[in-house]
Amino acid sequence: MKKVVIRECPDYTPDHVKTTLKESLEALGGLEKWIKPGDLVFLKVNLLTGKEPKEAVTTHPQLVKALTELLMELGALVILGDSPAGPFLQGRMRKIYQLTGMTTVAKETGASLNWNLESDPVYFSAGYRLKDFHVMKAIKEADHIINVSKMKTHSMTMMTGAVKNMFGIMPGLKKAELHFRFTDPIEFGHAMVDICEYASPVISIMDGIEAMEGAGPSAGDVVKNGMILVSEDPYSLDIVASEHMGIKPDSVPTLKAARQRNLCQSLEKVTLDTSLGEGIKKSFKLPDTREPDFLEKYGRWPVVGSIFKQISRKHLRPKPVVNPKKCTKCKECYTICPAEAIDMLEKVPGFRYDKCIRCYCCQEVCPEKAIWIYRPKILKWFGGTK
């Protein structure tokens, strides 16, 4: 059975974070179980976009600093990095490192920031959907990867945690291409699992001290959550996190895909080492992107199901909408859209919904939270959503 450790940590006070993180890791055998002096360790943090730590969009720098210090105490060499949404360019990375606090972490600890923006093609024979793809060159050069994710809801995948965090080893706009290639959520989930399996992080850590609910992964609301989660198995870690957030594992494409491949166990088969006295359950507000599930109810009647499917795709699917009062015409959404379904109409984004693949990358990268998801109220009448 896989083990997941949860420890309470009320805030980002340095002593609280470092002590809690060290205790969590010791419950799994300590960092020395995986790391030796001289090892080059890549900390794959979540740096989705250039947001300050208080917005809970990215892995908090205090957790990254504590982990870096623990690694350096063992004699490891540490490099911090991610390939955020959008172009993978030095100027963009400099801004993101500064805003997210990673520049400060590097200065205070002596860790390196990843400035190697090159990528290498890899062949992964065990991939279910992905065998040939590109990864950051810095990932290949590291001895070990440690996965340092953020607990958040996600408009496309319901939650983003340890497994999806590894998507960031794929450089820049290559990620957008993958969205367009795998428009079905479960197929996309398999691709995420392929990348996670290739990366094989030695340990996965989740920043759940402050989390995000609602319109995640970037436009949601901050939740004071007070916990750090650690596991050697990213799938078990995500299962526990999904249970805590009130999300059914099978509604998370990465977990459903992992289950289909026998990589993921049920919560009952996870060994849970927790300091929480009242259990782990807590319901998060979920994204408004859930699609109607009544097709499954009527699926036994092909003709009826076909009619409902056509109606659903045209009239009942959630869709991104722009708030013109918040939009600054920065064109981030236009640049990122993998389906090229956005036009700049008088410099304000306009959506061609017949082309939109509902990946919600546009909402994800919008710096002003100007894109929201419209979800027809009539969906509630059908008694359920995915």
Language-model segments: residues:
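N-terminal and secondary-structure boundary signal
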Residues: 1-328, 334-339, 343-348, 353, ...
